[in-house]
UniProtKB/Swiss-Prot annotation:
Record carries keyword DNA damage: yes
Lineage: Eukaryota, Metazoa, Chordata, Craniata, Vertebrata
Keywords, in A-Z order: DNA damage, DNA repair, Nucleus, Transcription, Transcription regulation
Gene this chain is encoded by: Gtf2h4
InterPro entries: Tfb2_C, TFIIH_p52/Tfb2
Superkingdom of this protein's organism: Eukaryota
Record-stated family: Belongs to the TFB2 family.
Protein name: General transcription factor IIH subunit 4
């Protein structure tokens, strides 16, 4: 008899991206208090607060004594009570302020002293320099200007995106490939096989670059401690990078080994340029400096001129030279012809169902075609031919008619008696999923597998 795990089911996770406040709110109080020990962190957090919360922080920034809660409540008109509740909860959740008992028993509010002190330093100047001076290293013989840094950052990040869509020319480190899998953006269908894109990964590719980077860095931070990294150290460094000057070099002197390792990962993502691994200076790119712009806009999609024409005969014409966009189209269509500035593809049942098998949904394919429709297509109402959108949905429904159940397959029984005996036991336990007496095979639930296996071993020993 042979026992085989039977796999099934589609994993179509919806991509959810937390903003900075939600991420910080999920950290422990001890980690938050340590984070506020750096002025760059305090300034970055302050910058992302709602207007009302910013106003409160500025009014209390130079107060050493707590204010009565009733007095703070009077700063806001009654019609803005909802905004007041949200800002109050946010400042408390981020430990920017806390309650303190006043003489006489009244409740008061006071800013977190560590946050208050370091935000003052960030706004007024003073304190320790955020990074070491590069003057001791002398002028950089291989200095990079802003256009070359922009080009480098774009190329490095595109390598990551090309790897996700399966471009053979794109190669990334094992750490990065593992992170993409842990984030649910890619998955391996079989051991040893190269990973392929998931439904969440396809949604990820539809985001704009700042939102992609923010989501990606969130996944990185969630696994940082398992890599032996100090979360506070690398978060503070990220915030520090966002206040860097584009085109200026910075020294790596004084960095810990953990931070130097993090710098190499940022180098691979395109957030910093470092000529060699052992180079003593680095240049933050625009991606690092604008990283926080993905915080509030993490759900945004790409806004670019449309280039796709879809015909009712399922032909697709894409007027683009972008290798990434062509690779994305190839995920759900069959490539027919390729010209210098245009590709022709065919949307087929097989190509769509292959994409669906990877976890990409029909709605995502339709959304991709609609958001990249050529201006000529935009003049139509609806933008995409209904025959195309309906058929893509039908192909998805056709595949989803089957209901998948995980189980363990038992087959290759030596006799019908053995099969009937084990079948009766599985049925008695209520763990039988499927049976075929003619072929002597049965499937049991993963939970019931151990009981059935033990019963079978006992029967073999007793016979």
């Amino acid at each position: 008899m042979e026992i085989t795990p039977a796999r099934g089911g589609l994993n179509r996770a919806h991509l959810q991206c937390r903003n900075l406040q939600e991420f910080l709110g999920g950290l422990s109080p001890g980690v938050l208090d340590r984070l506020y020990g750096h002025p760059a962190t305090c300034l970055a957090v302050f910058r992302e607060l709602p207007s009302l919360a910013k106003n409160w922080v500025m009014r209390m920034l130079f107060l050493e004594q707590p204010l009565p809660q009733a007095a703070v409540a009077l700063w806001v008109k009654k019609e803005f009570s909802k905004a007041q509740e949200e800002s109050t909860g946010l400042l408390s959740g981020l430990r920017i302020w806390h309650t303190q008992l006043l003489p006489g028993g009244l409740q008061g509010l006071i800013l977190n002293p560590v946050f208050r002190q370091n935000l003052r330093i960030a706004l007024l100047g003073g304190g320790k320099a955020w990074s070491d001076d590069t003057s001791q290293l002398g002028p950089d013989k291989h200095a990079r200007d802003v256009p070359s840094l922009d080009k480098y950052a774009e190329e490095r990040w595109e390598v990551v995106l090309h790897f996700m869509v399966g471009s053979p020319s794109a190669a990334v480190s094992q750490d990065l490939a593992q992170l993409l899998s842990q984030a649910g953006l890619m998955k391996s269908t079989e051991p040893g096989e190269p990973p392929c894109i998931t439904s969440a990964g396809f949604q990820f590719l539809l985001l704009d670059t700042p939102a992609q980077l923010w989501y990606f860095m969130l996944q990185y931070l969630q696994t940082a401690q398992s890599r032996g990294m100090d979360l506070v150290e690398i978060l503070s460094f990220l915030f520090q990078l966002s206040f860097s000057t584009l085109g200026k070099d910075y020294s790596v002197e004084g960095m810990s080994d953990s931070l130097l390792n993090f710098l190499q990962h940022l180098r691979e993502f395109g957030l910093v340029f470092q000529r060699k691994r052992k180079s003593r200076r680095y240049y933050p790119t625009r991606l690092a400096i604008n990283l926080s712009s993905g915080v509030s806009g993490a759900g945004g999609t790409v806004h670019q001129p449309g280039f796709i024409v879809v015909e009712t005969n399922y032909r697709l014409y894409a007027y683009t030279e972008s290798e990434l966009q062509i690779a994305l189209i190839a995920l759900f269509s069959e490539m027919l012809y390729r010209f210098p500035n245009m590709v022709v593809a065919q949307v087929t049942r097989e190509s769509v169902q292959q994409a669906i098998a990877s976890g990409i949904t029909a709605q995502q394919i339709i959304h991709f075609l609609r958001t990249r429709a050529h201006p000529v297509m935009l003049k139509q109402n609806p933008v995409l031919p209904p025959t195309i959108t309906d058929q893509i949905r039908l192909w998805e429904l056709e595949r989803d008619r089957l209901r998948f159940t995980e189980g363990v397959l038992y087959n290759q029984f030596l006799s019908q008696v053995d099969f009937e005996l084990l079948l009766a036991h599985a049925r008695e336990l209520g763990v039988l999923v499927f049976e075929n007496s003619a072929k002597r095979l049965m499937v049991v639930t993963p939970a019931g597998h151990s009981d059935v296996k033990r019963f079978w071993k006992r029967q073999k020993h007793s016979s």
